[in-house]
Amino acid sequence: MASISYLLAPLVLAAVLQPTAGAPLDAPTESPAGETSGEEAETGSPDDALAVALESVLGATKLHKNEFLVEFQGEVKYDFLDRYKIPSLPAKCPYSNFGKDACLRRLLEGLLIYSVLLKRVEEEFPSSSILSEVRFYSNILIKELENKVRDRDQVMRLTSSQEEQLLKDTDYPDTFHRKMTAHGILYNLHYFLVDCRRVINKRAKHRESAGSRVVRAVTFYHPKKRS
């Protein structure tokens, strides 16, 4: 895979994600350039380290599309990977009837599965700088999620035998299928993150809207006294 230069160097992000106690972090003001309308970041995302880490992973995974198109010289369309079936992929966050904490838990459990699947990608592309960045930012995001979710001890984690089975299920004898599986893992990881971000941001906007209605109601029932 071709080398890349990403906006946030690993050491810079590591410093950013270790702020002084009480000092809030500024989340990215805009999503990485070039996202399609289905991937656009929605306003209202939480302004904290988790949001920064999530955007950083997405910035790394999004670079995969151009690299895929260059590798296949346009002969294979990128959305072909959407139809390429990979077993045991984690479920995405439903857009409705799903709370923020439930989505954060789904995101965490999904990332733990993808962290195993990325071993398959590493076997095919051992020198990939994209993969290195995806792993780095994913590990930061996992730590942030572990600090956010409730009852983290109840988070489902794969056993060693389950990890072995997962890698076995994605192992193919021919080179083409192994390579397409590796590409498919990065493709599905990106859109898994996109969908989770959309749900998280929706819940954040819903809370902001509810808080605004409460403030208006209090103001209405308790008008300022005339001097």
UniProtKB/Swiss-Prot annotation:
The keyword Metal-binding does not apply. Keywords: Acute phase, Cytokine, Disulfide bond, Growth factor, Secreted, Signal. One of its GO terms (biological process) is hepatocyte proliferation. Gene3D superfamilies: 1.20.1250.10. One of its GO terms (molecular function) is cytokine activity. The keyword Lipid metabolism does not apply. The gene is il6. Residues 24-45 are annotated as: Disordered. GO terms for cellular component: extracellular space. This is Interleukin-6. It comes from Takifugu rubripes. Pfam families: IL6 (PF00489). After induction, highly expressed in spleen. Can also be expressed in kidney after incubation with PHA. Residues 1-22 form the signal peptide. It is found in: Secreted. Disulfide bonds join C93-C103. Component of a hexamer of two molecules each of IL6, IL6R and IL6ST; first binds to IL6R to associate with the signaling subunit IL6ST. InterPro entries: 4_helix_cytokine-like_core, IL-6-like, IL6/GCSF/MGF_CS. SUPFAM superfamilies: 4-helical cytokines (SSF47266). Belongs to the IL-6 superfamily. Cytokine with a wide variety of biological functions in immunity, tissue regeneration, and metabolism. Binds to IL6R, then the complex associates to the signaling subunit IL6ST/gp130 to trigger the intracellular IL6-signaling pathway. The interaction with the membrane-bound IL6R and IL6ST stimulates 'classic signaling', whereas the binding of IL6 and soluble IL6R to IL6ST stimulates 'trans-signaling'. Alternatively, 'cluster signaling' occurs when membrane-bound IL6:IL6R complexes on transmitter cells activate IL6ST receptors on neighboring receiver cells.
